[in-house]
């Protein structure tokens, strides 16, 4: 990951391989934003972009405007979702209006449009950005343990392929997520995940501070761990 300061206080992490063009591949505007660079205060400090929170809507609007501007888009072209830890991926169609007026229930957005950005929000969960740069299809997925176990990543790939992508051409970048040492879960998580994937038992460790709980390596690996920053951070392509 490479960090670019879009403004003096607005860092954006991005994958260098997508940020440059080549004779074979076009560059792709994308990024994983942090909790820094916004105007929210208190528990939402500072780049909170979640309309589902109790933050001041005017602050959320300004934070989202900054993210959109950092990617080169107007705020009404930054489309997000009402995420609910599902395996539902949806297509952003050509007929979609302003992003401010809609937040459909889903955990992944896919689009073939070149005039918009699709975004998901994470705190502890894993953001995954997808791109088929050969065929002009992109996706953004929110993968918590329920969504990942339920197939949100597979749903995103399937939706992309249904709209012109090919498996051989799809690339994915995994963004920052909670580290195992900070991710305490209960029996419900362990039982559900291990029932579906028996080999995943190795990724659960009894929490030494709470023996009735476990520490879990979300999605089995968390290559870019974060510690303790819980505002709703946007990831976009």
Map each language-model feature to its residues.
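Active-site microenvironment for binding and transforming phosphate-containing groups
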Residues: 1-222
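Single conserved hydrophobic/aromatic residue that forms the stacking wall/gate
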Residues: 220-237
